[in-house]
């Protein structure tokens, strides 16, 4: 519930007992002589025994008049209300409910829940008579069917002080636990948004993903949502009730998803929808059956020039998810398993589809995403758009320590507030230190990043130089055809790279296609790039000149580390029609000679990706036109300072020793 204060406006014809009802509620007894119109009354939280009660409830008494001023006052009060307590007392005022009052509320344009109250029974004997059922059937049910804004109806007596507290609770309940978002009374079934929300609750509660909530899982859900356990008889009754409707809803394995939905439909149908709301709010749903932006996207402070990566906790959660949904234990998630995994989410992330999923990362021969590819995809998504990962972790139920218990088999019996759950999700991420630049006579260049494990590489080169083949080789896939197809849209792939010494990082490689000029002119996009892979076709004499043209057109590229690569090295090498041959060219700009690579030589491909990763991690070594000593020169002042300190300390020690010797003599 988002209302800290509930405002109840009491409406009805003159003389139906509105003021008497309010007085009896406050005094807990009937007061015969009261003023015609009571002032607004504030009732504190402690007045109600419900743990979900608002901080305060304001009850506003009203009267209807043809006076323009009083009519405007009534309009204003109704527009400020959270719920309307509509009272009638006899046949005439009952007729006025459907003829005047309910159309009047609609004409005002308000969409408020209404509690219909019959304040007519002052004879004690009448409460137990059959007339009671007849009155409900004849008077109230037709109105309920015609006007869906009526949440509930109740018979009360101000004189006997009967059912007034219950009527007040129904008004609070109409705001705290509204039936309208959940249940379609005319159709007698839950609304689609309610079904979707409950399906997500079922998904997150079905810890072993067998399609049923076992007794243990039902108990854990009950304790998590309401802080108390079921009795054994309660579970038996629930199962029996569902099995009576359809045996498939509750079997020996537990309650099925359809059975769980049916159970909540029964709650709503019987006026126990506060139970359903208790479940939904535990899983952070708003009154509109959505997950709020505050929950999906908690604030994460990311300094300028910093990036966001997954933390060990985030990777662990994603590994656990992969293993849970790899039902056939073949080491890959097929289409069916992916569909099941993403069921509680909006679907496969749009970012993945934009990058031509599933061809963006590593998959097996059957097209199933491997664990390596799964983690690489999320690493790329987090690096490029961490808010997407943040939202999907929310949909999939990441809650810090609670997530560890969920996969380890421990009971998850502590519900987290929406704010706490959002804050716990931040533990799935780490923010890297801001990218720094070192100054030198030429343009700035980036300092060595020492806390990053995800890097971005732009693959640049002439048409037909082999860029697409290189990206396919990065994913350990052969090129499907030798027929050249120009890359139109940008293509991104991601995979892990194991470097010398066993350290692993993730590399996102982008071929820019026809958007190359736009990307290279965009400072923000260039800031995302950590290393450039300049490619040329070693068997095409006109291929290399394209690289020099790019560097001249976009001088800013020289502020990024780069690796030159001669592709198609298995073909006969041709002299390049350019002023300098590639080896001479790279020597002139003081970087390593081109690496000769062929997709038919796996070891050469592996070596290239290692060099790209190392260039991204140590950008000073791959920058064009840098003197060899410049990278080490940045350390020299500290080394000299350290050496001077050591010499000074030695000199002081020598002087101190000689002074002591002289003193003794």
Curated annotation (Swiss-Prot):
Residue sites binding Ca(2+) 1 per the record: 206, 208, 210, 212, 217
Chain ranges on the Mitochondrial intermembrane side, renumbered to this chain: 656-665
GO-annotated biological processes: heme transport; mitochondrion inheritance; mitochondrion organization; mitochondrion-endoplasmic reticulum membrane tethering; phospholipid homeostasis; regulation of mitochondrion organization
Compartment list: Mitochondrion outer membrane
GO molecular function term, any single one: calcium ion binding
Domain EF-hand: 193-228, 313-348
Domain Miro residues, every copy: 3-177, 452-618
Sites where the protein binds GTP 1: 12-19, 61-67, 119-122
TM regions (residue ranges): 635-655
Residue intervals on the Cytoplasmic side: 1-634
Keyword field: Calcium, GTP-binding, Hydrolase, Membrane, Metal-binding, Mitochondrion, Mitochondrion outer membrane, Nucleotide-binding, Repeat, Transmembrane, Transmembrane helix
Binding-site residues, Ca(2+) 2: 326, 328, 330, 337
Superkingdom in the source lineage: Eukaryota
GO CC annotation terms, alphabetical: ERMES complex; mitochondrial outer membrane
EC number: 3.6.5.-
Residues holding GTP 2: 461-468, 498-502, 567-570
CDD domains: Miro2
Stated role: Mitochondrial GTPase involved in mitochondrial trafficking. Probably involved in control of anterograde transport of mitochondria and their subcellular distribution.
Protein name, as recorded: Mitochondrial Rho GTPase 1
Species classification: Eukaryota, Fungi, Dikarya, Ascomycota, Saccharomycotina
């Amino acid at each position: 519930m988002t209302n800290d204060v509930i405002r109840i406006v009491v409406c009805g014809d003159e003389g139906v007992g509105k003021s008497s009802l309010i007085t009896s509620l406050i005094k807990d007894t009937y007061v015969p002589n009261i003023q015609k119109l009571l002032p607004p009354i504030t009732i504190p939280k402690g007045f109600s025994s419900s743990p979900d009660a608002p901080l305060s409830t304001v009850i506003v008494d009203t009267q209807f008049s043809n006076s323009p001023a009083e009519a405007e006052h009534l309009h204003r009060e109704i527009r400020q209300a959270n719920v309307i307590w509509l009272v009638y007392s006899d046949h005439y005022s009952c007729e006025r409910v459907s003829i005047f009052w309910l159309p009047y509320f609609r004409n005002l344009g308000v969409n408020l829940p209404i509690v219909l109250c019959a304040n007519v029974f002052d004879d004690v004997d009448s409460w137990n008579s059959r007339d009671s059922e007849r009155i409900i059937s004849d008077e109230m049910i037709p109105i309920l069917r015609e006007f869906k804004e009526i949440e509930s109806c109740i018979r009360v007596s101000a004189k006997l002080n009967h059912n007034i507290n219950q009527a007040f609770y129904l008004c609070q309940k109409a705001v705290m636990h509204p039936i309208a978002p959940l249940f379609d009374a005319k159709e007698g079934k839950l609304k689609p948004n309610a079904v979707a929300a409950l399906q997500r609750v079922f998904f997150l509660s079905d810890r072993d993903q067998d399609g049923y909530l076992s007794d243990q899982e039902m108990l854990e859900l009950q304790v998590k949502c309401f802080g108390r356990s079921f009795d054994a008889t309660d579970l038996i009754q629930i199962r029996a009730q569902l099995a009576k409707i359809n045996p498939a809803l509750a079997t020996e394995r537990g309650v099925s998803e359809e059975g769980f939905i049916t159970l909540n439909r029964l709650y709503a149908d019987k006026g126990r929808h506060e139970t359903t709301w208790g479940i939904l709010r535990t899983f952070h749903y708003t009154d509109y059956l959505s997950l709020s932006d505050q929950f999906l996207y908690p604030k994460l402070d990311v300094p300028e020039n910093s990036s966001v990566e997954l933390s060990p906790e985030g990777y662990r959660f994603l590994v656990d998810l992969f293993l849970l949904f790899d039902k056939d234990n073949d080491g890959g998630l097929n289409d069916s398993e992916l569909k099941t995994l993403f069921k509680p989410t909006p679907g496969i992330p749009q970012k993945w589809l934009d990058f031509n999923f599933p061809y963006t990362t590593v998959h097996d021969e059957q097209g199933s995403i491997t664990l390596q590819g799964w983690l690489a995809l999320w690493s790329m998504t987090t690096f490029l758009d961490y808010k997407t990962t943040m939202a999907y972790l929310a949909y999939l139920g990441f809650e810090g320590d609670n997530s560890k218990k969920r996969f380890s088999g421990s009971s998850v019996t502590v519900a987290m507030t929406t704010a706490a759950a959002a804050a716990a999700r931040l533990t799935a991420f780490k923010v890297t230190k801001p990218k720094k630049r070192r100054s030198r006579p030429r343009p700035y260049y980036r300092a060595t990043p020492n806390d990053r494990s995800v890097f971005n590489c732009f693959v640049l080169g002439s048409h037909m130089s082999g860029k697409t083949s290189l990206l396919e080789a990065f994913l350990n896939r052969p090129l499907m055809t030798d027929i050249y197809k120009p890359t139109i849209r940008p293509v991104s792939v991601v995979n892990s790279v194991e470097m010398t010494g066993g350290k692993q990082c993730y590399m996102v490689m982008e071929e820019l296609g026809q958007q190359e000029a736009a990307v290279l002119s965009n400072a923000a996009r260039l800031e995302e790039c950590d290393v450039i892979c300049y490619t040329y076709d070693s068997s095409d004499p006109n291929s290399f000149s394209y690289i020099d043209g790019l560097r001249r057109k976009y001088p800013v590229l020289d502020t990024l580390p780069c690796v030159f690569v001669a592709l198609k090295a298995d073909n006969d090498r041709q002299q390049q029609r350019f002023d300098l041959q590639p080896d001479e060219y790279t020597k002139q700009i003081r970087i390593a000679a081109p690496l000769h690579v062929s997709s038919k030589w796996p070891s050469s491909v592996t070596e290239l990706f290692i060099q790209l990763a190392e260039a991204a991690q140590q950008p000073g070594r791959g920058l064009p036109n840098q003197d060899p000593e410049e990278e080490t020169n940045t350390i020299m002042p500290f080394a000299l300072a350290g050496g001077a300190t050591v010499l000074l300390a030695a000199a002081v020690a020598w002087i101190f020793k000689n002074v002591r010797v002289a003193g003794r003599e």
